[in-house]
Amino acid sequence: MVRDYDLIILGAGITGLSVARERIKIDPDCRILVIEKERRIGMHGSGRNSGVLHSGIYYPTDTLKAKFCAEGSVLMANYCKENNLPILECGKVILPTKIEDESQIDLLYERGINNGATVKIISQEELSEIEPEAKTVTKRALYSPNTSVVNPHAILNQIKFDLEKSGVTIFFNERVISANPDANTVETNKKNSFKYGHLINCTRQYSDVVSKIFNVSKQYTLLPFKGIYYGLS
């Protein structure tokens, strides 16, 4: 039997869950299915990151990344506060470790201002008041007071709770293995068949592989990079 949904979202990371959340807010009657290949949420990039909520100073102005980062950081901070989720509003300092890097401070400052972020160029004395152990070789640093640190797993679990309360269906341990775009249908590894009105690919680093199942973007291949973080006690 083919089950019918208005919207199918592939991937239950922060992107997939957030897309589902925004859609169900607009249309509470929308029949939404989220398909996740892992046994739970947060097993990849969405749950394995530093948790830094960037304020929007890194990306060139007039790019979608700049727009979404600046606006999204405010929305995410508000979401954490509204749901009593952990958020550390500690700010961030960026400082050059070499003389030749000083121009980057001016570049990031200009981008931050143009992107609508709150940024300030500070002296070594001001830096020492924020972080006594930090030193800048150029006597200048960039201060981003609105940068925060959040708990990615707490956010993912809260959005999942919100979605399930709103009637959104989430299937785990399931992945799409074949698709018929002309008929708007997909089949999964569990031999389930689903029909969709719209389908959104939110599988992040696997999005190129998934797209090829739908005969889309065959000329593209993602090149993923792995980040490693140290935990300080």
Language-model region placement:
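Beta1/beta-strand and adjacent pyrophosphate-binding region of the FAD-binding site
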Residues: 2-15, 33
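Glycine-rich FAD pyrophosphate-binding loop
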Residues: 24-48
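Helical element adjacent to the flavin cofactor pocket in flavoenzyme catalytic cores
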Residues: 141-198, 202-209
